């Protein structure tokens, strides 16, 4: 049901509608909150659609819904707007980031009072700045369009630039400040420029000595939980441990169903005997596997590492993958240290 203003709040309070909208006059940003049982069972979080022009009071209305937890933290935000008030767009983005929310492009669901919505969506101008506030930002799909536009005027441009930097987005992605033209970005370009991360933050690396050898810990925060790879080099070999944090119940279910678990490097088996041991520790599935030091040569140039487990049928696999380019320097340092250790071990045995 689509309702406006105070009627929406009343419908939520009475439980008469779980899909409601504010600001439906056509000159304001409208809000549709979908938190019905089916949505939550599939998406795990509410799906919130913001559509129409971003008016000056849009952030205040959305903020009130967040404050009342009608829009709870970690919600999925779907945007479809031609833009509007820049300050309001930036304020919306900061609300999204504070709530660890995920931004997408998308049109609201059809309802009895609003049976027709365009299938394609666009997000441009102030909407693009709101989108940048998502902790996780999904690139557009299908015919959806994303338009980045620089801000003119010294004060406004400085504010917009500072905001994008705070959100971890390179301001240059939004174009040259000397031009006011919209740059329409496709999914590949947004992913390449870091504007879209498709549910995965850039991995971080910690390299150093550990237990008589060297250790490299790679951590990535993703939409479905935390992913971690721990590589440890010892005189007698290399071990890889993966932590796939997905919740205690789901972790136990996956391990119970699994028939095969393994690591991959560059989409290929990490070892000739590619079988990892798996267990549940807390809320994580934990993979462990030993790899001969002789296979270290593939690590410095690796572009992808992954940990997978297959279910009983073998047709579906679960797990995660991690790009190595963001942690290339630490990976090379670790590989160099391991190779040096392998030489010393060989000399000692000789």
Report residues per predicted region.
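Catalytic and GAP-homology cores of small GTPase regulators
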Residues: 26
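Proline/Glycine/Serine-rich low-complexity intrinsically disordered segments
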Residues: 66, 79, 100, 108, ...
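C-terminal segment of classical bacterial N-terminal signal peptides
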Residues: 2-11
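Charged, glycine-interspersed solvent-exposed loop segments at helix/strand-loop junctions
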Residues: 75-76, 147-209
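Short secondary-structure transition/capping segments
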Residues: 115-121, 151-154, 210-214
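Cleft-lining beta-strand/loop regions that shape enzyme active-site pockets
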Residues: 30-142
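Stable alpha-helical elements in mature extracytoplasmic
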Residues: 58-62, 88-92, 123-127, 134-135, ...
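A generic "folded-domain core" signal
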Residues: 14-17, 21-22, 30, 46, ...
């Amino acid at each position: 049901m689509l309702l406006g203003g105070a009627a929406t709040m009343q419908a939520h309070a009475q439980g008469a509608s779980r899909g409601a909208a504010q600001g439906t006059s056509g000159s304001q940003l409208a809000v549709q909150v979908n938190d019905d049982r089916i949505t939550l069972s599939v998406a795990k979080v509410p799906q919130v659609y913001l559509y129409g022009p971003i008016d000056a009071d849009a952030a205040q209305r959305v903020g009130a819904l967040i404050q009342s937890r009608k829009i709870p933290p970690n919600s999925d935000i779907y945007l479809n707007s031609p833009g509007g008030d820049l300050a309001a767009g930036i304020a919306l983005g900061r609300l999204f980031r504070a709530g660890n929310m995920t931004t997408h492009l998308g049109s609201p669901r059809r309802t009895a009072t609003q049976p027709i919505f365009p299938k394609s969506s666009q997000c441009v101008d102030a909407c693009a700045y709101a989108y940048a506030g998502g902790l996780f930002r999904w690139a557009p799909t299908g015919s959806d369009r994303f338009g980045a536009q620089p801000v003119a005027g010294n004060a406004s441009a400085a504010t917009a630039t500072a905001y994008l930097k705070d959100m971890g987005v390179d301001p240059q992605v939004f174009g040259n400040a000397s031009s006011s033209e919209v740059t329409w970005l496709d999914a590949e370009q947004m992913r390449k420029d870091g504007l879209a991360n498709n549910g995965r933050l850039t991995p971080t690396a910690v390299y150093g000595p550990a237990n008589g050898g060297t250790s490299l810990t790679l951590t990535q925060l993703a939409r479905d939980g935390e992913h971690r790879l721990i590589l440890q080099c010892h005189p007698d070999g290399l071990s890889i441990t993966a932590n796939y944090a997905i919740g205690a119940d789901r972790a136990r279910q996956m391990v119970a169903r699994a028939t095969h678990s393994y690591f991959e490097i560059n989409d290929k088996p990490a070892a000739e005997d590619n079988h990892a041991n798996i267990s549940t520790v807390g809320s994580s599935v934990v993979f462990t596997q030993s790899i001969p030091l002789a296979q270290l040569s593939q690590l410095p140039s690796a572009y992808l590492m992954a940990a997978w487990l297959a279910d009983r049928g073998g047709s579906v696999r679960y797990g995660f993958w991690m790009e190595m380019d963001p942690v290339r320097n630490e990976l090379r340092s670790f590989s160099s240290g391991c190779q040096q250790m392998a030489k010393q071990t060989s000399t000692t045995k000789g």
